[in-house]
A protein has these predicted regions:
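Partner-binding and oligomerization surfaces adjacent to conserved cores of proteins
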Residues: 1-187
Length: 187
């Protein structure tokens, strides 16, 4: 007798404004999400750490290079976080895209929320730095995907491949706009 074990895919959520139609269509048509470089992240305390002069400078160099050569795609574990709808989905006039990540080359990190910044040690990696956020952001329930190292970020903008399961529209999306998006998506 065979055991039929079914593994459900992990579903994550990308909150989006609908103001940039081209970006929305890129996501829906190409099944890809954009990543941002560290310097493009919206939290001014993003990626901070406490440096100790006892730590070899090569560790510090590796962290700085890692910040500048990897893209970050931020997703959430939940689709019903009010502040996420407000901050990232244009005050409920946007959408939340439910996705299953299909990329095999991006690294998954569960974000850890802390009251203090990371202390740099000999074993600290870029992943250790980029997976930590201030505890005030804990409501986001964030999962991050890090791209492979990109040698020339001026010429390359890698995207995270996903399978879209559904699109949830905010309650403030006007019915006419919703119907247009529905036609586009089902075409």
């Amino acid at each position: 007798m065979k055991n039929n074990i079914s593994i459900e895919p992990e579903l994550l959520y990308k909150y989006r404004s609908l103001e940039n139609l081209e970006r929305f269509l890129d996501i829906v048509i190409d099944n890809k999400l954009y990543g941002a470089l560290y310097k493009e992240m919206n939290d001014p305390m993003e990626g901070y750490f406490q440096y100790s002069p006892d730590v070899d400078k090569s560790v510090l160099t590796g962290i700085w290079e890692g910040k500048n050569k990897r893209y970050i795609c931020s997703l959430s574990k939940k689709s019903n976080i009010g502040l996420m709808w407000t901050h990232y989905a244009n005050e409920n006039k946007g959408c939340c895209i439910e996705v299953e990540v299909t990329s095999k080359t991006w690294e998954r990190l569960d974000v850890e929320y802390k009251k203090t910044i990371t202390n740099l040690s000999e074993t600290t990696t870029i992943e250790d730095i980029l997976k930590v956020k201030a505890s005030m952001w804990e409501y986001e329930q964030e999962v991050r995907y890090l791209s492979p190292v990109i040698a020339n970020t001026k010429k390359s903008n890698p995207q995270l491949t996903v399978r879209i399961h559904r699109i949830i529209f905010g309650y403030k999306v006007k019915i006419k706009k919703y119907n247009r998006f529905k036609k586009i998506i089902s075409a």
